[in-house]
Structure formats: C-alpha cells, structure tokens
C-alpha cells in the first residue's frame, strides 16, 4: 500500500536522514508514528539499535505489539515485563531508560537513536525530571526523535534541546487529517484507554473525570 506523505513527514524524515535530532509536534493521528518507523529503519540498517520510550506501561505494551506486527525485531522493558531485551528496537517506559543511563547499561553502546514519545510529559510536575535527565545525561553520540501532539512554548523547548544536544530541527504541523469529534462513551473503569487518560497530567482531562464523577452520582 502506498500513500502520499505530508509535508511535515517529508521534512522530519529528511532531517533524520541528515543525522539531526528532530522535534515533531503534530496532532494525534497525523502520522508521527510513521516518522518513527522510518527512523528505526534507518538506524537498524546501520547496525545501530533504537530505544522507543513511552510514559506508561500500557502504552509501551501497545507499541511493542504494533512494532512486532510490523516484523521489527522488538523487545520490551517495563519493569513488569522483560521480553527480548537485546533486540534491535527496545520499547521501554521512560523511567527504565533513565535507570539504564544512570547505571551505564552496556546496551547503550549499541544505541544510535532514542525516541521520546509524548515528550510533553517533561512539563509534568511529578515526573518531568525523568525526561530532563534523559535528555541531559544520555551519551552525546545518541540522536533523539521527540514526538508530541502538543507542547507549550515549543520554540523555547527546541532552543533548550539545541543547547544540550546540538543540531535539532523543529517540525510542526497543525493539520488534523482525522476530524476531531466530541462524543460520550461509557467505559468500564478498568478499561486500558481510560487508565492512559487518567495517568495524564494534562489539566484538560480534568473535565472528563469531573463529568465521570457527576455521572456516577447521577446513576446512584
């Protein structure tokens, strides 16, 4: 299956091929994961491994399954699960990577690229320092691909990355290929997607749970 790439995807992939760090800010569903796939392909073809981090275990498990289904040699490190830890691509929680850096894990010698998905978590008051520590202390030879749907003050964040990691391209798109629709869906409180939303520190999600609590009171 073939499809036309969007301008921001072409720009990001071009920067990756030039061995730059890249910060991609684009709406959910716009194709950021495809950029990551092309980056993984580039580095693994050069016999360099890749670490792909997400902020929570459920999302790491999902990405592990996604990449495995693409026939990419993929391992998983979440604390709860360890699968194929010496694979070309390791999907891990952000804290796991931070611990690998501080312990001088031998596997870092084979890493050419770190993908930090949901990098806007850096502004989280409780966990944001984990992202900062990774960006500051990761070996200087490792390149970064930063992915986010929304980053406040993205230019300021970009300049900070440049000061620490060198040449970094900022790629930004406001185009939303999938229309945003607002609707109400009843979910079991143990639903995995609901857990992901609850774990977010984005204040906009407070509206969801304010409604959820009111709805539960109404049902009683």
Identify the role of each PLM range.
Residues 1-25:
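Conserved pre-motif I regulatory segment
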Residues 16, 44, 139:
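Conserved ATPase "switch" residues in P-loop NTPase domains
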Residues 18-24, 48, 87-88, 142-143:
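Pre-Walker A (Motif I) flank of P-loop NTPase domains
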Residues 28:
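The conserved Walker
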Residues 32-41, 127-132:
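Motif I (Walker A/P-loop) of helicase-class P-loop NTPases
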Residues 44, 48-99, 159, 169:
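Conserved nucleic-acid-binding Ia/Ib motif block in the N-terminal RecA-like helicase ATPase lobe
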Residues 90, 95-96, 104-146:
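SF2 helicase catalytic motif II
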Residues 136, 143-145, 150-220:
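Conserved interdomain linker/interface between the two RecA-like ATPase lobes of SF2 helicase motors
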């Amino acid at each position: 299956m073939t499809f036309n790439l969007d301008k921001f995807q072409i720009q990001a992939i071009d920067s990756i091929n030039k061995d730059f760090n890249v910060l991609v800010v684009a709406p959910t569903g716009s194709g950021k994961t495809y950029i990551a796939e092309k980056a993984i392909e580039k580095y693994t073809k050069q016999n360099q491994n890749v670490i792909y981090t997400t902020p929570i275990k459920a999302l790491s498990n999902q990405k592990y399954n996604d990449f495995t289904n693409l026939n990419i040699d993929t391992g998983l490190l979440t604390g709860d699960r360890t699968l194929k830890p010496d694979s070309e691509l390791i999907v891990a929680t952000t804290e796991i990577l931070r611990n690998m850096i501080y312990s001088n894990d031998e596997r870092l010698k084979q890493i050419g690229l770190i993908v930090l998905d949901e990098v806007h978590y850096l502004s989280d008051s409780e966990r944001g320092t984990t992202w900062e520590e990774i960006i500051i202390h990761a070996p200087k030879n490792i390149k970064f691909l930063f992915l986010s749907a929304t980053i406040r003050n993205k230019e300021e964040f970009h300049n900070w990355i440049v000061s620490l990691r060198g040449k970094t391209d900022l790629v930004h798109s406001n185009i939303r290929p999938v229309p945003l629709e607002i609707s109400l869906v009843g979910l079991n409180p143990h639903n995995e997607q609901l857990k992901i939303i609850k774990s977010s520190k984005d204040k906009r999600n407070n509206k969801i749970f304010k409604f959820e609590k009111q709805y539960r009171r109404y049902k009683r």
